[in-house]
């Protein structure tokens, strides 16, 4: 938790992101911007960044019959690394969670969706939680996410509503996870039971306690977890 981001992501070396602490990123106090409107930056060049048909270059599916140039994913990461750091006070940041996905993938050696599927969802018997449900489920059983009138210009069903997550292939650390209430409930029950589900341990109790505890007196955040305000207010 006290390691620098550069320990895991070589691409940050030589930038001011190299020395960001993992703990500060998980508590949203690293100084990273709240978000960057990546999709808006592509709209002036829409014909060169998006295509209605998939090929080796345009293979990142952001919506039905809409594919993004694969190379644009690198542009997203570069924009994050080049963005100025701001105040280290608490402010939720999509960018922190986007980079945390890369950390998980570096450590595990597999993509975030594969890691979660193999480590939790499949062994727990959860069949209706995961990323990009349009790939694995009947679209008629998925509630539409939104009508996107600005970016993808269609009703989204089975595709993440967050534009940045869509541009990252529907799998991101900050958005993209779909679930039924039942499967989400089973996952939360595992956490409530100290990391055990149906007799099998998935997480250490001390890990859950550490990550779900307040970390600083000036922020309600745990490590990756949001928590009630110190005043007791929940909204």
What are these regions (language model features)?
Residues 1-2, 158:
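Glycine-centered small-residue hotspots that permit tight backbone geometry or close packing
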Residues 15-235:
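Short, surface-exposed loop or secondary-structure junction motifs
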Residues 2-15, 123-124:
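Short, glycine/proline-biased beta-turn/loop segments that scaffold the active-site neighborhood
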